[in-house]
């Protein structure tokens, strides 16, 4: 066989046998028949709106995050076995097999693409045979044209008479058979897709049911809340109505004109029902919202007795309180005056007796314990008077000569009355026998107060009588003390014996007219102080008819203001306050020769030169406040015995005149020790 070298003419145009077939360009512009599931560009895309799966698109709260649509098996859609023959060729056209193979090789890529498109179109149509046949025809049209060209060239060489129309019909039938075999392999994929679609629909249905249940539950809760609100509103209305009724009752009880009472409803138990609140009037209406139970009106007069009773009860309670307070106050005063006052040392007119059933105080206790200063004054008679100050209290006693116990005590029953003077309770005009203890040179110095008083009396009498036998006169700005020669026997040199007993010298010393050199005595020798060291500071008379002071402490407080120049320190200028006295046993002994007792008694009793009509009393002995008062702290400080240089003595003369003397203490010499 020889091949013809003629030029192959193009085959005639074959009419379109399938009117529903579209071109490849038109296939992408027209949407698929079932747009609910698949689209043109992505057949298995889920972006298209799906009516049965709206919950996937409207899931704003993430309620359907549990549903998982996996596409792990999506590769099976494109897993085709290309080794199988695409077309079964009949035997009568077996000689054209080689040409078909070559044409298939040339259009291999296009055939695969058309085959995949036909498979996708078949899946999306859910078993629609019409759509599959249309897509198959549309996809196989380019292949048929290629086959026609090859067959025309073959026919011209072999048969030459065959027509291209018969060949195209045969090739079209073979393509239909190959598509049918491919559809059988894709049935499993369709089943899986259907199962997945059913599962998705079931999950969507379950989600809808769950939403419906939640909505019903919320509606039920809203209804219950509305019922509760209605119930509370009803209760509030009832309470408000009851409050209005109570206010009306209070207005009636207080006496205000009663308001028009509301009509009482029958007493029925109020049942709270879950209904909306009752409609009421506008704001400010006094109409009761609910029925008010009937209240029994109480008469106005019934409240008045209660008020009266309440007032009576209040008055009784107040009376009880006042009575209890007054009773407590009375008990306090009874305790104060009945218990505390008797312990205080009361001195009336120089006497201290029993008070409140307490025992009398023994004067000798002050001498034994040395808790205060002791003043002893004697005028030569048998009666002596002791005065002691301890812890701010003043004590005095009278001692008769020869009537003294072993301890120096006092017999209070032996108090003779003085003619023309008050009784023993007011015997402030009696002479006071005093001896003064003054701290000096780190010890206690005993000053004989008797000598001071006698020198004062001698000076006064010498001035009054104007006698010419004055032995010495010292003149300064202020009147000085003078001692007449006739009364020199009154200045007896003290001899300390026993409990501050005064022992003068013999009359032989006084008859010589010499000055006595000693007011202090230690060891029986040594000049310490004379009477010329005392100077009168001032004096004043008591008003005629005045009562003699019964307390020595009050007089000393009065004259304390005149002595000092600082009036604001009155409470700190008692010299005998706060000054401790400590006498040890070694200081209670004295050395030296003492005159015999007979000479002493003779001197005391035989002194006829001293007038007996005059009386004197040492009221107080003061220290210089400039030496014992601290100017910064305004407090009394214990003085330094070495720096103490001056004392002040206040003497009461004949109960009509107070005289204050300033006595200068010696700066050198032996310090005195007294028993």
UniProtKB/Swiss-Prot annotation:
Highest taxon above the source species: Eukaryota
Transmembrane helix in keyword set: yes
Leucine-zipper: annotated span: 229-236
List of glycosylated residues: 427, 469, 562, 589, 601
Segments traversing the membrane: 324-344
Annotated region (Disordered), positions in chain: 1-20, 89-193, 294-315, 592-615
GO cellular component: cytoplasm; endoplasmic reticulum; endoplasmic reticulum membrane; Golgi membrane; membrane; nuclear envelope; nucleoplasm; nucleus
Molecular function in Gene Ontology: DNA binding; DNA-binding transcription factor activity
Classification via InterPro entries: bZIP, bZIP_sf
Reported function: Transcriptional activator involved in ER stress responses. Functions as a stress sensor and transducer in ER stress signaling pathway. After proteolysis by SBT6.1 (S1P) and S2P, the N-terminal bZIP component is translocated to the nucleus, where it activates the expression and production of ER chaperones. Following ER stress, activates proteins involved in brassinosteroid (BR) signaling, which is required for stress acclimation and growth.
SUBUNIT field: Homodimer. Hetereodimers with BZIP17, BZIP49 or BZIP60. Binds the CCAAT box-binding heterotrimeric factor composed of NFYA4, NFYB3 and NFYC2. Interacts with SAR1B and STL2P. Interacts (via C-terminus) with MED37A/BIP1 and MED37B/BIP3. MED37A/BIP1 and MED37B/BIP3 dissociates from BZIP28 under ER stress.
Name this protein carries in UniProt: bZIP transcription factor 28
Gene name as annotated: BZIP28
């Amino acid at each position: 066989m020889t091949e013809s070298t003629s030029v192959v003419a193009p085959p005639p145009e074959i009419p379109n046998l399938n009117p529903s077939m579209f071109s490849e360009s038109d296939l992408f512009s027209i949407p698929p028949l079932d747009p609910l599931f698949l689209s043109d560009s992505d057949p298995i895309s889920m972006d298209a709106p799906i009516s049965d799966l709206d919950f996937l698109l409207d899931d704003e709260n993430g309620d359907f995050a549990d549903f998982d649509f996996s596409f792990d098996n999506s590769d099976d859609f494109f897993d085709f076995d290309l080794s199988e023959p695409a077309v079964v060729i009949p035997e009568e056209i077996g000689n054209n097999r080689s040409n078909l193979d070559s044409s298939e090789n040339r259009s291999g890529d296009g055939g695969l693409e058309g085959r995949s498109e036909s498979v996708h179109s078949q899946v999306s149509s859910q078993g629609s045979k019409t759509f599959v046949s249309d897509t198959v025809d549309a996809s196989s049209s380019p292949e048929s044209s290629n086959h026609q060209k090859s067959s025309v060239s073959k026919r011209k060489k072999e048969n030459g008479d065959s027509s291209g129309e018969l060949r195209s019909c045969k090739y079209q039938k073979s393509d239909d058979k190959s598509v049918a075999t491919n559809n059988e392999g894709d049935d499993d994929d369709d089943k899986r897709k259907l199962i997945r679609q059913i599962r998705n629909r079931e999950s969507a249905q379950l989600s809808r049911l769950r939403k419906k249940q939640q909505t019903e539950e919320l509606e039920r809760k809203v209804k219950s809340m509305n019922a509760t609100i209605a119930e509370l509103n009803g209760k509030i209305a009832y309470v408000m109505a009851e409050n209005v009724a109570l206010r009306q009752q209070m207005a009636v009880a207080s006496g205000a004109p009663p308001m028009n009472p509301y009509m009482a409803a029958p007493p029925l138990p109020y049942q709270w029902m879950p209904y909306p609140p009752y409609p009421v009037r506008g704001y400010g209406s006094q109409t009761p919202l609910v029925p008010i139970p009937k209240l029994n009106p109480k008469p106005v007069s019934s409240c008045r007795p209660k008020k009266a009773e309440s007032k009576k009860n209040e008055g009784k309670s107040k009376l009880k309180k006042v009575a209890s307070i007054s009773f407590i106050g009375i008990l306090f005063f009874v305790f104060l005056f009945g218990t505390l006052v008797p312990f205080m040392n009361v001195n009336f007119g120089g006497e201290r007796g029993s008070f409140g059933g307490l025992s009398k105080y023994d004067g000798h206790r002050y001498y034994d314990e040395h808790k205060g200063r002791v003043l002893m004054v004697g005028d030569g008679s048998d009666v002596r008077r002791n005065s002691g100050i301890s812890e701010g209290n003043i004590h005095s006693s009278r001692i008769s000569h020869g009537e003294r116990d072993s301890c120096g005590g006092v017999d209070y029953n032996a108090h003779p009355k003085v003619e023309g003077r008050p009784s023993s309770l007011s015997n402030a005009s009696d002479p006071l026998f005093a001896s003064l203890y003054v701290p000096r040179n780190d010890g206690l110095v005993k000053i004989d107060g008797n000598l001071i008083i006698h020198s004062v009396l001698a000076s006064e009498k010498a001035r009054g009588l104007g006698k010419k036998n004055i032995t010495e006169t010292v003149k300064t700005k202020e009147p000085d003390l003078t001692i007449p020669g006739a009364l020199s026997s009154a200045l007896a040199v003290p001899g300390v014996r026993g409990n501050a007993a005064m022992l003068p010298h013999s009359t032989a010393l006084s008859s010589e007219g010499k000055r006595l050199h000693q007011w202090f005595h230690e060891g029986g020798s040594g000049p310490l102080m004379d009477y010329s060291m005392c100077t009168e500071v001032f004096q004043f008379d008591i008003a005629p008819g005045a009562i003699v002071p019964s307390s020595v402490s009050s007089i000393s407080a009065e004259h304390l203001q005149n002595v000092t120049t600082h009036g604001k320190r009155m409470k700190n200028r008692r010299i005998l306050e706060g000054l401790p006295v400590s006498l040890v046993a070694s200081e209670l002994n004295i050395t030296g020769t003492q005159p015999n007792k007979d000479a002493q008694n003779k001197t005391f009793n035989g002194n006829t030169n001293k007038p007996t009509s005059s009386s004197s009393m040492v009221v107080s002995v003061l220290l210089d406040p400039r030496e014992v008062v601290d100017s910064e702290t305004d407090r009394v400080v214990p003085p330094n015995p070495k720096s103490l240089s001056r004392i002040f003595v206040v003497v009461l003369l004949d109960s009509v005149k107070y005289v204050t003397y300033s006595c200068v203490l010696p700066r050198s010499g032996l310090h005195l020790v007294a028993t």
